[in-house]
A protein has these predicted regions:
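Non-catalytic signal-transmission and effector/linker regions of two-component phosphorelay proteins
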Residues: 1-9, 102-124
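Charged docking surfaces used in two-component/phosphorelay signaling
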Residues: 19-26
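Acidic, metal-coordinating helix/loop segments flanking the phosphotransfer/catalytic sites
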Residues: 34-52
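Acidic catalytic/metal-coordinating carboxylates
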Residues: 37, 63-66
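Active-site residues of response regulator receiver
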Residues: 56
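The feature encodes the CheY-like receiver
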Residues: 60
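Hydrophobic/aromatic residues positioned on beta-strands within the core alpha/beta folds
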Residues: 79-81
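A Lys-centered signature of the CheY-like receiver
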Residues: 99
Length: 124
């Protein structure tokens, strides 16, 4: 199981999407945390050792980029649907997962990011 020992935080206001990510990533051995709001994401990042963040651009009434601006060293994949990620924003993240994405895309992206050397949550 490639995910053993790695923690993934899924930040999205879509309950079904978070559940889909959680179930599939847990089957691969990842520990998965879920945040339906920017505030919950910030709380989890302060209290948990997170390796990979899957971050929706628009999280409810919050702004996913607000969380992105607070991250120090987590590996980040940005979720986006109709929103076009400009070159500057793309440079701030490690990967972009365009909705709808396949489970293979999810698995490969998280696996690639989790395999990188990094030191867990560095939330400011």
């Amino acid at each position: 199981m490639g995910g053993v020992g790695h923690t993934v935080l899924v930040v999205d206001d879509d309950d079904s999407l978070r559940m889909l990510c959680r179930v599939n990533l847990e089957l691969e051995g990842y520990r998965v945390l879920e945040a339906p709001t920017v505030e919950r994401a910030e709380e989890l990042l302060r209290g948990e050792n997170v390796d990979v963040v899957l971050l929706d651009v628009h999280v409810g009434s919050g702004d996913g980029f607000k969380v992105l601006a607070e991250l120090n060293d987590e590996r980040v994949a940005l979720f986006t649907g109709s929103f076009e990620v400009d070159a500057q924003r793309s440079a701030e993240v490690d990967a972009v997962l365009r909705k709808p994405f396949t489970l293979t895309d999810l698995s490969e992206t998280v696996g690639r990011l989790a395999a990188r050397e990094a030191g867990g949550s560095r939330f400011r």
